[in-house]
UniProtKB/Swiss-Prot annotation:
Keywords: Amidation, Cleavage on pair of basic residues, Endorphin, Glycoprotein, Hormone, Pyrrolidone carboxylic acid, Secreted, Signal. Residues 107-141 form a propeptide. Its main location: secreted. Glycans are attached at residue 91. The gene is pomc. Residues 1-26 form the signal peptide. Belongs to the POMC family. One of its GO terms (cellular component) is extracellular space. This is Pro-opiomelanocortin. The modification Phenylalanine amide is found at residue 87.
Amino acid sequence: MLQPVWHACILAILGVFIFHVGEVRSQCWESNKCTDLSSEDGILECIKACKMDLSAESPVFPGNGHIQPLSENIRKYVMSHFRWNKFGRRNSTSNDNNNNNGGYKREDIANYPILNLFLGSDNQNTQEGIMEDDALDRQDSKRSYSMEHFRWGKPVGKKRRPIKVFPTDAEEESSESFPIELRRELSLEFDYPDTNSEEELDNGELLEGPVKKGRKYKMHHFRWEGPPKDKRYGGFMTPERSQTPLMTLFKNAIIKNAHKKGQ
């Protein structure tokens, strides 16, 4: 009773495998192991053959599709096109060298499927951090290269100092070789301050006298100490008008108004 049931179960499993194989179906039936399906051993051998053909012909996707690590050759074929496939001293930083996780390679990780599952996320994070650091380093190097042509790209300690140029004998001779008329024109171009001789004498007398400690020092020898006498008050008040006191003007106006009212 049990043999027909067991035989039917095995045939059902074989049918499921053959249905999923698809293109490999003809290869399973053509193999020598699938010729004898009358016994249980022949059916099991046929199932193993179909399973081997299925694993060999099915497309390989990167990742843990069957909860098993891929073989090393397939991993190299899949990941050899990317730069982050390489591990070891070239891509490890100083921080990774301090830790013990910097020297792992794909062969070591592939031998331990459990470590491959748990360390996948850590390796991905470290790879992203390394790529960000490399990008920042490249950006800094490019910036230093592009900014070295400008004055503000250099450090503060290296300031540009003015170059002292000493006149040579040839320049002195060239200045003496100017004609007299050109020298006069050059001298007329300068703006000399207009000062009165009387004011200079007064200022000279004040400077020669002793300066007391209690008084403030007045800078009479500068132009901005005070305007000349003829330019004070905007020039509209002449000395004649300034001699008339303000009170006399008010008195004269009041007297004139009184005479007009009396008349």
